Amino acid sequence: MFAVIKTGGKQYRVAPDDVLEIGKIDGEPGTIVQLNEVLVVGGDTPVLGVPAVAGASVAVEVLDHKRGPKVIAFKKRRRKNSRRKRGYRDELTLIRVSEILTDNAKPTKGPRPKKAKAEAPAADAAE
């Protein structure tokens, strides 16, 4: 099953367990957020929204907030000694798609537990 979601003015094709970077959304790392603007729900019988699919949403887990690469906007007017240099970095959110929900369903999966450190078993093997 897949879905096409719209967030931050962009559209993304997502499936469960996909990890992607999108424009910044509210939510602390480790929490589940629902994205309600679903344009298409695909599977055995695809459903196209007009413009959005009624009652459909995508539950995503917020993994991290970070900043994207620096983008430089440089303008120069030749022979005028006129230059302007501006730069910015986008605020991004790293998310993992938990599940695709239809019929106004609530998310059933919670955030994934963090992995245990691999150093603990190595210390036991040395004894």
Swiss-Prot record:
The keyword Electron transport does not apply. GO terms for biological process: translation. Residues 102-127 are annotated as: Disordered. InterPro entries: bL21-like (IPR028909), bL21-like_sf (IPR036164), Ribosomal_bL21 (IPR001787). It comes from the Bacteria. GO terms for cellular component: cytoplasm; ribonucleoprotein complex; ribosome. One of its GO terms (molecular function) is rRNA binding. Pfam families: Ribosomal_L21p. Keywords: Ribonucleoprotein, Ribosomal protein, RNA-binding, rRNA-binding. The keyword Ribosomal protein applies. This protein binds to 23S rRNA in the presence of protein L20. PANTHER family: 50S RIBOSOMAL PROTEIN L21, LARGE RIBOSOMAL SUBUNIT PROTEIN BL21M. Belongs to the bacterial ribosomal protein bL21 family. Part of the 50S ribosomal subunit. Contacts protein L20. This is Large ribosomal subunit protein bL21. It comes from Bradyrhizobium sp. (strain BTAi1 / ATCC BAA-1182).
